[in-house]
C-alpha cells in the first residue's frame, strides 16, 4: 500500500480518538495497526521459507521490528530469523567526539527494544577505563548543539532531544535514538517530546523517500562507497560464512535471559555473536531494572499483537490496544479499532 498515506492514517486517526501518540510507526496505536498490516505478509513469506529452505538465515529490516519479529519467531521458533536496524550507528557518530578517541578504541554494550534502547556500558579498549564519566560531563552541552543529519536533511541544533534529555535525567543512561522513536513507547512522552522537530523530520523523510528515484539510481544508492545508511547485512553474512565468532553491536532476537527484566521470547535488541550457527544474543549484565520496567510495559501488547496476527483475532487486537501504555480510554479504543478496520479494510479486514 501507500506507505505514507497509511502511516498518516495510523498517526492521525488515533489522535482523533484521543490518543496522545507522537509518531505512530512502532509503538502506540499506530504501531499496532502498522503491525497488523505488515506482520501477516512477512509471516507468509516465512511460511514458504520454512517449507522450501528451512535452514536459511533470514534477516528482517521491516518495522515495527519487535512485533514483526515476535510474530515470526512465535510461529516459526526454529527459523534462523534475526531483525536488524541501523539505529545503533548513532554511537559511531557521537561517541568519538564525546570520548575524544577513535571509535575503534571504544567498546559498547547497548540494548533494550528496537528503537527503545540505551547504552548500558561503554569503555576505552586500550585502558579499559569507563567512558560514562566523560559522557556525563559533556552530555548537556554536546546534545544541546547536536544537529541530526538524516537523508540529506539537517535539523536545528538540539532537535528531537526533549524526551531524550528527560530519559537521561531520570534513568542516567544514554538513549540510542531520539524523540520520534523513543516517544512511541511511553504514556507521558507527549508532554516532553520535541513534537515540532518530529514533524519536521517526518516531512523531510517523506519528501526524500518520494523523490528517491528522481535523484539517484538504485545501483548508485546501494554502492558500498556511497552508502551512508550503515546497514550491516553484508558484514554479518560474511561473518556467518567465515565462522568468525565476532560480536555485532545490535541484533533483534527472542529474549533468552539476555535482558533479565523482559519476559523470555519477547524480541529484544542486544549485542550478538556471529558464527557458522548464525546469530546468537549476548546477555547484558547489570541492565538497569529501572529502565527495564519501561521495556516490560511493552510485553503484553507485543504478545497480543502476535495473537491477533496469527489467529486473525479482532478481540486480541482490541486487547493489544488496552495493554498499550499509550492507550488510556477503553471506549475510544474500541471505536478506534472499528474505525481503522473500516478505513483500512483492504489490509485489516481479516480481523474477525
Model-assigned labels for residue ranges:
Residues 4-75:
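Rossmann-fold NAD(P)-binding glycine/threonine-rich loop
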Residues 44, 48, 71, 90, ...:
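Alpha-helical scaffold segments in soluble metabolic enzymes
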Residues 30-37, 56-60, 79, 83, ...:
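Conserved aromatic-histidine-acidic binding/catalytic patches
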Residues 52-53, 57-126:
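Rossmann-fold dinucleotide-binding core
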Residues 1:
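Carboxylate/His-rich catalytic cores and anion/metal-binding grooves
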Residues 46, 50-56, 83, 233, ...:
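Small-side-chain structural scaffolding
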